[in-house]
Amino acid sequence: MSTVQTPVQYLPAKTANSIKLVDEAQAKTNLLGMTQAQLADYFKSIGEKPFRSTQVIKWIYQQGVTDFEQMTNLSKSLRDKLSANACVIPPKVIHRQYSDDGTRKWVFEVTGGSLVETVLIPADDSKLNGRKTLCISSQVGCALDCSFCSTGKQGFERDLTAAEILGQLWVANASYMSDENDSLENIDHSLWENNVTNVVMMGMGEPLLNYRPVVSSMELMLSDHAYGLSKRRVTLSTSGVVPKMYELAKELDVALAISLHAPNDELRNELVPINKKYPLEQLMAAARNYVFDVNPRHKKHVTIEYVMLDGVNDSNEHAEQLVALLGDLPSKINLIPFNPFPHANYDKSSNNRIHAFSNILSEAGFVCTIRQTRGDDIDAACGQLVGQVADRTRRSAAWQQSIKDRENS
């Protein structure tokens, strides 16, 4: 097992192959997370041709290059101009843990000192180049306060920028290019590969409440000039921000997941409070609109996420209600064993209960899966690792302050 507790230190670039992760003059424009259109506008604003955006995007995302001096198909004068006025800076990793089964977790410090968490889960198929799914955060904390969610109990601080969102994917790919100490310096960019095959916007926060930065980030994930991921390999999960679901359906074609967790309004109002604003009838209508678009060649489905809470939402009656609720909606149901966290008011459903629930759904004709727990040796519900690191940071700061106080007394 490799579970690392020591914060990873990132240093300024000093060599041609090192990665600059320090913003020397915070007035510089961070190009990370800019869409091709945004980057083209930036180049026009500095008196350059907009086609440079394609070149720079390829360097950043297909080669992992953040040092403009290494972008050799740019003129020397343009490289100098970019070095003076721009930067490519992902969020800073302050903590990471790697599991025996390949699961990786990072805690990032974003602007202002806030912390967000990212998790990478490899497929359990023993393939060296198999599926690797990255769970990305979109906000610092979450305002929805779902009663079973650790992140919601930490409150909401702010939205993440596109650079902070896409930077999580950039660092996850970079981690496969680095040594066992997870240093991101001295990477041979000629060997760069984008190992992450799937992205799910299921980390901290509600993605549709941070709509524009999230959509911009997903555009780059799909772009052939950047990550080139298939639209079925990029999934946005929402608790049900209905107006934005309609907006997303018009703007971007990615896979949709709904954090449902209850088959009736009374129970969902308790578990997922946003249901009081957008009840199930409205949510299901928005889901059907997303799936049944005007192009008959688009064969879409919605993934229904359903956390299994002992004695709360896991009865046979609840399963039958779920069957009736979904009706003819093309959907795959993912049952999620509850992952307890400190002071949680719920328990995990038994394995027998989960399988009985699953059988009812399967017999009704739905594809139903049970999420497998991964990374047991570094296990934590979404948001818990951030809480643990933040607690340690606060304790360390308090201890250091007590030393200073004693020295000054």
Curated annotation (Swiss-Prot):
It is found in: Cytoplasm. GO terms for biological process: rRNA base methylation; tRNA methylation. SUPFAM superfamilies: Radical SAM enzymes. Residues 128-377 form the Radical SAM core domain. One of its GO terms (molecular function) is 4 iron, 4 sulfur cluster binding. Its cofactor is [4Fe-4S] cluster. Reaction proceeds by a ping-pong mechanism involving intermediate methylation of a conserved cysteine residue. This is Dual-specificity RNA methyltransferase RlmN.
